[in-house]
Amino acid sequence: MICLGLEGTAEKTGVGIVTSDGEVLFNKTIMYKPPKQGINPREAADHHAETFPKLIKEAFEVVDKNEIDLIAFSQGPGLGPSLRVTATVARTLSLTLKKPIIGVNHCIAHIEIGKLTTEAEDPLTLYVSGGNTQVIAYVSKKYRVFGETLDIAVGNCLDQFARYVNLPHPGGPYIEELARKGKKLVDLPYTVKGMDIAFSGLLTAAMRAYDAGERLEDICYSLQEYAFSMLTEITERALAHTNKGEVMLVGGVAANNRLREMLKAMCEGQNVDFYVPPKEFCGDNGAMIAWLGLLMHKNGRWMSLDETKIIPNYRTDMVEVNWIKEIKGKKRKIPEHLIGKGAEADIKRDSYLDFDVIIKERVKKGYRDERLDENIRKSRTAREARYLALVKDFGIPAPYIFDVDLDNKRIMMSYINGKLAKDVIEDNLDIAYKIGEIVGKLHKNDVIHNDLTTSNFIFDKDLYIIDFGLGKISNLDEDKAVDLIVFKKAVLSTHHEKFDEIWERFLEGYKSVYDRWEIILELMKDVERRARYVE
């Protein structure tokens, strides 16, 4: 079977032809380069209308049009005008050639072409582009989003900064080139919230640094170091949460060599495999659309023309994945001398004055600039110790601190002989209620955890909260709303089958202790509506 795929979600027009055994017969793209900086959606759509006929003609010179068995197109997510042109061209081809048509999810297409062109089987995927920033993993018949941007995509961040300093579009390659000449680490915000990330503050600070007269090379270096360190960290956090044995990098920004270096170093530290597709398959392309179309069609997915309406807000986790029958992927292995290895720290069991204790050491991250890494590890070690002591004043169970060594970024704390809430919450929904109570008490006292997942609660005879490395004091309702969103998304991605029950019980516990819950939940809806893609 042979499929022709059409890609046109943003500024690239792509046509690809792929066989059912994965042979790419044709794959070519033409990028829209705006006369002025920035992409105009209408002009991008005009670009697709102009270039699709050229590419299709060229494709049919390589593969006879009568050999095509299926037409696939990017149904979303993306720019509405671009998607409409792409869908119209696909429908026209389908009707003209009298071949079936299928619309596919652009984000998932990146993952599947990555798996086709590498040895990855069941990877945790970091998808980074001008329009998307997501950490994705396959769990129970869907690709679940474990982390994503809370505002703009990383590629958009780079492009906006490039426009601000009058670099050509797309700005990423020019920033990468200038960054190689940078030496000074300019102080910029580092915004990680659980497995989520935000770039708006980073972008604004970089612009201000430019206005203040900092060398452009130093700003480009610092912008990359901060942005890519944040991306690598949330990938590592998702890796520790899912225990996948592989990481794959896809999307247009995957072409950046510094980002590749960082992720490779992180994967070596976690003893997992790292994959990146060939560069021609990293950015948007028609072959990835054709390949996903084949996977879906071969496994019984058909579409009528009425079903081919575009979906600009097409979330990755909206797609029922029927083409993955069995998972054979590797699992992350924790070294034998450790009882745990998180995204930030190695955890060893020990004894101290006849007490069972653990030593939590925030180890050096080889992927980060040494100056940035030193600051992050030291500040988070101090913060965690401070908040673990503080929350006891609110009646919240937490480990006892025996010693804090800031020079070596170590904390000695009491050992809790229990199980992670992640492993028992589905069979004991009272744990969800207790988590809600704990979070309600935190918010009542203006403490934001910033990394609420079911991996950061331990259930023994009581429920203990851990890992305040990202914690902060804030009386802002939006910070509390985002705290809940982080937890909600963690539950949705990890405990999807019991999500409704867990979330309902969590809210019952939260409401029972925090009288401002209505305000926070309403604001939570508002923040969620601002997300990049919502159903």
From Swiss-Prot:
One Pfam short name: TsaD
A single MF term (Gene Ontology): metalloendopeptidase activity
Gene Ontology CC annotations of this record: cytoplasm; EKC/KEOPS complex
Main location: cytoplasm
Binding sites annotated in the UniProt record for L-threonylcarbamoyladenylate: Y127, V128, S129, G130, G131, D159, G172, E176, N256
Keywords: Acyltransferase, ATP-binding, Cytoplasm, Iron, Kinase, Metal-binding, Multifunctional enzyme, Nucleotide-binding, Serine/threonine-protein kinase, Transferase, tRNA processing
Modes of activity regulation: Activity provided by the Kae1 region seems to be regulated via phosphorylation by the protein kinase Bud32, which is itself activated by Cgi121.
Enzyme active site: D451 (proton acceptor)
The enzyme's E.C. designation: 2.3.1.234, 2.7.11.1
Region feature (Kae1): 1-323
Protein kinase domain segment(s): 333-535
One of the GO BP terms on file: tRNA threonylcarbamoyladenosine modification
Binding site for Fe cation: H106, H110, Y127, D284
Cofactor: record remark: Binds 1 Fe(2+) ion per subunit.
Catalytically driven reaction(s): L-seryl-[protein] + ATP = O-phospho-L-seryl-[protein] + ADP + H(+); L-threonyl-[protein] + ATP = O-phospho-L-threonyl-[protein] + ADP + H(+); L-threonylcarbamoyladenylate + adenosine(37) in tRNA = N(6)-L-threonylcarbamoyladenosine(37) in tRNA + AMP + H(+)
Known cofactor(s): Fe(2+)
Subcellular location: Cytoplasm
Subunit structure: Component of the KEOPS complex that consists of Kae1, Bud32, Cgi121 and Pcc1; the whole complex dimerizes.
Biological function: Required for the formation of a threonylcarbamoyl group on adenosine at position 37 (t(6)A37) in tRNAs that read codons beginning with adenine. Is a component of the KEOPS complex that is probably involved in the transfer of the threonylcarbamoyl moiety of threonylcarbamoyl-AMP (TC-AMP) to the N6 group of A37. The Kae1 domain likely plays a direct catalytic role in this reaction. The Bud32 domain probably displays kinase activity that regulates Kae1 function. In vitro, exhibits low ATPase activity, but does not bind DNA and does not have endonuclease activity.
Family recorded in the similarity comment: In the N-terminal section; belongs to the KAE1 / TsaD family. In the C-terminal section; belongs to the protein kinase superfamily. Tyr protein kinase family. BUD32 subfamily.
Name assigned to this protein: Probable bifunctional tRNA threonylcarbamoyladenosine biosynthesis protein
Taxonomic lineage: Archaea, Methanobacteriati, Methanobacteriota, Methanomada group, Methanococci
